[in-house]
Every structure is written in C-alpha cells, then in structure tokens.
C-alpha cells in the first residue's frame, strides 16, 4: 500500500519532534532544571507556570513536597508489588528524594519547554494514528503507531515519576531508554511506509554482520554513558566540581571511552569499503555523525565536561543509533 507524500513527511515531523524531546530532556538534566516544576502535568498547579516568586503561596515548598510524598508512596507500593522491594525501600529511605527546591524562574521555564516538546510529540503521534485509521488501516502500521502511542503515554507517566522521586538517577535512565524505543519504532514505521528504493545497500554477509555488531556496541555504549551520567549525579550530590569528575569516575567511564575506539575502527572499515565498492549513503552519514560524537566525547573528557557538550554528545549518540537502525532495516529488506 502506498501512502501520500504528505503522510510520509508528517512521519518525519513526528520523528523530529521526538528528537526534540530527547534534546530538551538532555538540556534539562544538564542545566539542573529537572525539578523546575515540582508537580506534573501542571507546573506549580498552572498550565502556564509563574515567572515570579510572588505568584506562589508562602508555603508552596511544603505543599508540593506533600504531593510528591504521596506519589512516591504509590510508586514504591507498585515497585513492591512487582518484586522490587529493595528498590522501593531505597527510594523511601533516601532523604534527597524529599528535598524541595526553591522556585527558580529559569529552571521552571526550561522544564516547562521540555514538557511542551513532549506535548507536541505526543499529539503529533495521536494525529498520525487518527490519519492511519482514516485513510490506510494497514494492520502492521496501525499496530506500530498504536504501540508507540501507548509507549508515549507510559513515557509521560514515567516523567511524572522522575519528578516525584526528585530525579533518582536510574529513573532518568529508564526515561531515556523508553524514548529510544519510541524512536526505534518510529524509524521502523518510516522504513515500512517508504516507497523509495535505497540504492547501494550491500547484500554480503560481512556488511550484515558488521552492521549488527556496530549497532549492538553503540547501544551498549549508550547504556554505559547513562552509567557515567548516574555516577556524575552522585558526585554532584557529594559536592565534587566539574574539574574533579573525570578523576573520580570509575570503570564504566574507561570502558565507555575504550569501546568508542572499537566503534570507530569498525565504522571506518565500513566507510572505506563503502567508498570503494558499495556507495551506500547511510554508511557515510553514520561515519560523519560518529566523528561528531567522538569530538564531543573528547571535549567532555578534556574540557571538564561543559554542559552544552553533554547535550550534544547525547543527541549525536541518538542520531547515530537511529542511522544504524535504518541501515539494519535496509539490510533486512
């Protein structure tokens, strides 16, 4: 079944909006704005958040802490039901969970813009689902879009958990990986509805094996990156400065850095082979994105981890993973 050009372009718009959410979320984390709104889905009880402290009641910190405590209790009860008693206990007994930040207009509006990006992406996906039901109704496409819509709802709900638990690091990691799953499904949908024949896709076993290997290593790299980020969050709580982070980071950081060289070697070989024999454009894109990713990684390691570079590092990693997924989809087709 062939879709209209408008529908195909709209699916790319949905994907870009999801990427915007990843970018905004990374910027929120980098800027320390995650608790800029202490409640969810509203921000300080309003759909449009305040800009001045005078717009809030005198006891706003106590009031929102009480709301968060109730949500934490519900989440911990859920964790206990699914057998994660120790995790629930750790969250309940962690005093940092119950620290309520003072109002900061810059942080509040940074987090609010992040939520607006999520709202736009979610509604674009809902419109996409309605469009499919109205004009196409192909079973596979409807299932993919419906699944992504459900995952987007779960992602939004889990965002409220991240806020309720005062940014417990592992909850932020799950929040990110849910976004990556949503991106993966959207890419698969785009691959399925595309009628364009991809030129130069290598069909030999070496390419298929190497593309799988690079994809898996890159995914593992992103997991290691989240572990490094969680370690940094712990260092921040302990009072370490940016200049001290690198020397305090443990084995995950060194493995993360070492695996980068492995990805570079493998993708450089594919890039060389592609220029010589295949002329498949996505290998070139993956190679250039990896170069940008490695550049930001070096900047993080040797320039005391500047905040905006942290955001760029995650965004390039997400783009690289997406291009590698598209390569795999092309190879399977």
Q: Where is each model-derived feature located?
A:
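Membrane-interface loop-to-helix entry segments
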Residues: 109-127, 171-182, 251-266, 310-319
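Membrane-interface helix-loop-helix junctions at transmembrane boundaries of multi-pass membrane enzymes
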Residues: 132-146, 271-286
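N-terminal signal-anchor transmembrane alpha helix
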Residues: 9-34, 217-227
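A juxtamembrane structural motif centered on a specific transmembrane helix
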Residues: 188-210, 326-333
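Individual transmembrane alpha-helix segments
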Residues: 61-123, 252-256
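Membrane-interfacial catalytic/cofactor-binding modules of polytopic membrane enzymes
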Residues: 221-263, 268-272
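Aromatic-anchored segments of alpha-helical transmembrane domains
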Residues: 23, 150-158, 218-224, 289-299
């Amino acid at each position: 079944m062939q879709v209209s050009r408008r529908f195909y372009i709209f699916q790319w718009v949905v994907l870009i909006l999801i990427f915007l959410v990843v970018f905004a979320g990374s910027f929120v984390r980098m800027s320390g704005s995650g608790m800029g709104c202490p409640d969810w889905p509203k921000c300080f009880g309003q759909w449009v958040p305040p800009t001045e402290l005078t717009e809030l009641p005198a006891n706003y910190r106590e009031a929102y802490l009480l709301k968060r405590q109730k949500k934490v209790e519900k989440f911990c009860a859920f964790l206990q039901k699914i057998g994660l008693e120790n995790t629930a206990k750790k969250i309940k007994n962690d005093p940092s969970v119950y620290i309520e930040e003072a109002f900061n207009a810059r942080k509040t509006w940074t987090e609010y813009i992040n939520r607006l990006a999520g709202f736009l992406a979610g509604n674009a996906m809902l419109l996409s689902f309605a469009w499919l039901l109205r004009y196409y109704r192909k079973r596979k496409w409807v299932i993919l879009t419906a699944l992504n819509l459900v995952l987007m709802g779960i992602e939004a709900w889990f965002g409220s958990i991240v806020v309720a638990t005062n940014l417990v690091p592992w909850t932020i990691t799950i929040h990110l990986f849910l976004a990556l799953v949503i991106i993966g499904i959207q890419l698969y949908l785009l691959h399925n509805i595309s009628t364009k024949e991809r030129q130069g896709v290598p069909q030999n076993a070496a390419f298929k094996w190497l593309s799988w290997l690079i994809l898996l290593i890159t995914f593992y790299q992103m997991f290691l990156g989240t572990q490094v980020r969680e370690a940094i969050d712990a260092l921040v709580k302990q009072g370490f400065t940016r200049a001290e982070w690198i020397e305090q980071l443990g084995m995950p950081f060194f493995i993360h850095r070492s695996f980068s060289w492995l990805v570079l070697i493998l993708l450089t070989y594919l890039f060389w082979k592609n220029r010589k024999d295949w002329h498949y454009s996505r290998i070139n894109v993956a190679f250039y994105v990896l170069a940008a990713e490695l550049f930001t990684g070096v900047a993080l390691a040797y320039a005391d981890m500047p905040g905006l570079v942290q955001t760029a590092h995650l965004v390039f990693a997400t783009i690289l993973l997406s291009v590698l997924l598209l390569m795999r989809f092309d190879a399977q087709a």
